[in-house]
Amino acid sequence: MGTLNLGSVSLSSSGTTFANSAASVTDAPAGSVVQSATTTASGAVATSSDGPNASGLITTLTPRLSGSKFLTILSGVNAHSNKTSSDNHGTVYYMYVSVAGGSYANITSNVIQSHHVDGALGAWIDVPLTTTFLSTPTYTLGNTVAFQPYYARATSSSGTVYFHHTGHSAAASQVYNLTVLEIAS
C-alpha cells in the first residue's frame, strides 16, 4: 500500500504484510533508536554527604553500533527541599557513565538538572523531577555502558540531601526509573 524510506532502509506494506529492507541493525539510519533499557526502583535515597553521591539507579546496555549517542531519561523522582532542617535548599543532579565495568565518571563537566528553593518555606516541599540528557561516551563494541545518576547538595548545609524523597504516604511506594536509548549516529 505504501513505502516508508528512512535513509537507505525501506519499510513497505501490502495488506497486513510488512517488508523491511534493512539486513541488520547496522543499516539503521542516523537518529534511529537501536535499543533501549530501563531500570525501575522505589524507596527514598538520601545521604548526609555533600556529594556527588551515587544514586544506585543503574541502567546498563551493550551498544550494538559504534559511535552511538545515548539519551538518558530520568523520571518519577521527587526532588526535595526542607528549609526547616539545616537549610536544605535542594539538590543538583549529574549523569555518570561507566564503560566496561570501569569507574563512574561525569558525562559532562557540569550539572544536568537542579532543584533549588531560596527563602524560608517554613516546611518541606517535593517537586516532580524528569530530566533528559544526550551524550556520546567513548566505548568499543562489546563493552558494557552503564549510566547512573549522581546527586549533591544545592547549597552548603549539614542536613540530609535526597536523590528521591518519600515524605508522604502516597510516595512511599512511588517508582522512579532511568531509561537509556541507544541512537544511531
Language-model features: where?
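Extended, low-complexity regulatory regions
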Residues: 57-59
